[in-house]
């Protein structure tokens, strides 16, 4: 789980650079992410379980996974016109409750006295996340981004749900291994977006930028593979990945001496306390 956080933090910083400095749009970023990650995954696939059952469930998993990834990037582009990436990650705190409830419903986690404490720590982490989000002080037009925001949250939650549903370690039912379904989903995305992006022209005009973004997807491969493993074991742990990335980015901001309010610092500390408390219980 910590490895996922480290890898995705690197990718978050590189994506920010790609948008701010290289001026890549959502389609270009999604294509580079999908194509480069799928290509790099070829080196890992021979060592993966590569479970594939010829059934509608396997193809459904691939299509649904491709859809969630496409929605994630497309909707994020709309939402980020009104709020920062930092604030968007804070909103993912809502999925913590949904994910742990899913673990309880599926039998991955047992309902008991510890569940009360876990929900309390989830609530604590969520409070910290929203404090961080509000620390920016910018007025956000939620009427404009309400539907995209809901769709984005459902896409992030749905990705983990797809993995746990089509390859459940608890029940022993697995139609397609998470890594293999992700690989086919990324290939599908790359093929669909290629006509819009014009890859050859892109690499000719922005060679260094496109190569930089592509190479930074090496940690993305490691992160995605490990994320899939986490999602098959626990939806709650999967949901905690993004808040942990938020906390890491928060500390990076402190190290770089970026402007930071008291509300921001307090939110970071509270969020960390919630994450640690959840893992301990």
Regions found by a protein language model. Give the residues of each.
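Transmembrane alpha-helices of multi-pass small-molecule transport proteins
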Residues: 3-14, 21-71, 121-127, 176-199, ...
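Membrane-interface helix-cap regions at the ends of transmembrane helices
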Residues: 37-55, 104-110, 127-139, 165, ...
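Loop-to-transmembrane-helix transition segments
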Residues: 1-4, 32, 42-45, 50-75, ...
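Glycine-/small-residue-enriched transmembrane alpha-helix faces in small-molecule transporters
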Residues: 1-24, 117-123, 139-175, 222, ...
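C-terminal transmembrane-helix exit sites in multi-pass transporters
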Residues: 76-79, 95-117, 229, 247-266
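Structural motif at transmembrane-helix junctions in multi-pass transporters
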Residues: 21-27, 75-91, 108-111, 168-175, ...
